[in-house]
UniProtKB/Swiss-Prot annotation:
It comes from Rattus norvegicus. It comes from the Eukaryota. The gene is Tmem38b. Intracellular monovalent cation channel required for maintenance of rapid intracellular calcium release. Acts as a potassium counter-ion channel that functions in synchronization with calcium release from intracellular stores. Activated by increased cytosolic Ca(2+) levels. Channel activity is activated by increased cytosolic Ca(2+) levels and blocked by luminal high Ca(2+) levels. This is Trimeric intracellular cation channel type B. One of its GO terms (molecular function) is identical protein binding.
Length: 291
């Protein structure tokens, strides 16, 4: 006997991402590119370079997953329909008369709708990446996690490499050095879908897809409406750190902070002592001049 919940989650898992969800993903990705300093001027002066950057933003996850599996990185170019769709979004975003697309996107309801639909595509990408890796390495769960994570959040890493080639790379924006919240959530989702695929997690795939997508959309909409990026996995990370490494990590960080404070206090004291010793020497110089 089938229940309404099963019908709902099963129908949701069979939802096609083309064209509406893909359009939302391309729109959010290209708008993020346009908001970079100098992106509009670069598009007018060098449209080909701007188009390549847009394609990296839109298909970066697929490119990185292909690299991890030793597949041709340009494999995404074989999907002509999606390339034409993403190129159309890039063109109307950058070259639409009177910038009508950007003006329409500036309304918060449209941003919330597009961002929520983009998070739905993230779930599908993770599931596709896990299944793709399983085709090469059956039940190789480490590879499956890596490829699922790369497919879902690899766009940020690929665009960081693009910024490095252009000379605009900054260490604080590198996903390898400092993972963002979407990158962490994608890694968590890749782990869950991998364990579900290898039957280590007792839940059906369509149920997990539905619940994980609801979680992603809720968090994303909440962060955008409150304009607060403080929704993080810090409590979970702190708990996991205590379980695996104890409290030594916290004590080490506290000792580092104390070590940073001590040199500054010593430096101020030494400078004060130098100021205190300066008047006698200057007085001696004046006395010699008077003699």
């Amino acid at each position: 006997m089938e229940y309404p919940w099963d019908d709902l989650t099963l129908a949701f898992s069979r939802t096609s991402m083309f064209p509406f969800f893909d359009i939302a993903h391309y729109l959010v990705s290209v708008m993020a590119l346009k908001q970079r300093p100098g992106a509009v001027a670069a598009a007018w002066s060098n449209p080909l370079s701007s188009w390549l950057s847009a394609m990296l933003h839109c298909f970066g996850g697929g490119i990185l997953s292909c690299i991890l599996l030793a597949e041709p990185p340009l494999k995404f170019l074989t999907n002509h329909t999606n390339i034409l769709l993403a190129s159309s979004i890039w063109y109307i975003v950058f070259f639409c008369p009177r910038d009508l697309v950007s003006q329409g996107y500036s309304y918060q309801p449209i941003q919330l709708l597009a961002a929520g639909m983009k998070e739905v595509t993230r779930t599908w990408k993770i599931v596709g990446g896990v299944a793709h890796a399983n085709g090469y390495y059956r039940n190789g769960w480490i590879v499956m996690i890596a490829v699922g994570w790369a497919r879902g959040a690899g766009g940020a890493i690929i665009t960081a490499c693009e910024q490095l080639l252009k000379g605009d790379w900054k260490p604080e924006g590198d996903e390898w050095l400092k993972m963002s919240f979407p990158c962490k959530v994608t890694l968590l989702g890749s782990i869950m879908f991998t364990f579900q695929h290898t039957r280590h997690l007792a839940i059906s795939k369509h149920d997990l897809m539905f619940l994980y997508t609801i979680f992603l959309v809720t968090i994303k909409v909440t962060m955008m409406m409150t304009k607060d990026a403080a929704v993080t996995l810090t409590p979970f990370e702190d708990t996991l750190t205590r379980m695996l490494f104890g409290r030594q990590q916290q004590q080490f960080s506290l000792s580092e902070k104390k070590a940073e404070v001590k040199p500054s206090s010593n430096g101020s004291a030494s400078s004060a002592s130098k100021r205190g010793t300066e008047p006698p020497s200057s007085a001696k110089r004046h006395a010699k001049k008077e003699d």
